[in-house]
């Protein structure tokens, strides 16, 4: 298992950042890997909600079943189960001037089989190249513009 982390600050408060994180239409704009929400049990990502997302990774079409464990002003935590398992957490902390600090972590857990290992390595390479930090930048920019 490999875990990738990134942290940034935002002029927007935790509620505004959470609104971007839980908006299914915004996912395609900020996700570190291009994915689209195919099916969602609730209008927004919320605690207990489930979603089906799909996209392309390393030239392969992949799909993930997502379960949201937390979605509140403290952050968003979810797990995604597919050819690679992902444990994702965004922590939100208010700062003294009305903004927030946003920390993200993504744990990549490879599954069995050659394809799964290759996709895990591709996911790790994308995250190691700074994609998570760039995603945080897009999240806070959208939250600040709202």
Name every feature range the model reports, one short phrase each.
Residues 6-8, 64-70, 87-94, 106:
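Hydrophobic/aromatic beta-strand elements that line small-molecule binding cavities or substrate pockets
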Residues 11, 30, 71, 81-83, ...:
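A short, compositionally biased micro-patch
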Residues 16, 29, 61-63, 88-90, ...:
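Short acidic, gly/pro-rich beta-turn/loop elements at beta-sheet edges
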Residues 79-134:
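Beta-strand/loop substructures that line and gate deep hydrophobic ligand-binding cavities in soluble
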Residues 15-18, 133, 137:
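Amphipathic alpha-helical segments that line or abut small-molecule/effector binding pockets
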Residues 1-42, 46:
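Hydrophobic ligand-binding cavity/cleft-lining segments
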């Amino acid at each position: 298992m490999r875990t990738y982390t990134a942290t940034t600050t935002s002029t927007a408060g935790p509620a505004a950042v959470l609104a971007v994180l839980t908006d299914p239409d915004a996912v395609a704009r900020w996700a570190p890997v291009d994915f689209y929400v195919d099916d969602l049990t609730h209008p927004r990502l919320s605690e207990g909600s489930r979603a089906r997302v799909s996209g392309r990774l390393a030239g392969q079409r992949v799909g993930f079943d997502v379960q949201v464990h937390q979605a509140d002003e403290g952050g968003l935590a979810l797990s995604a189960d597919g050819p690679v398992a992902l444990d994702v957490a965004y922590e939100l902390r208010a700062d003294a001037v009305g903004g927030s600090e946003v920390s993200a972590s993504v744990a990549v857990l490879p599954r069995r089989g050659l394809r799964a290992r290759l996709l895990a390595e591709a996911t790790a390479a994308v995250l190691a190249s700074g994609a998570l930090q760039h995603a945080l930048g897009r999240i806070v920019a959208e939250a600040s513009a709202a």
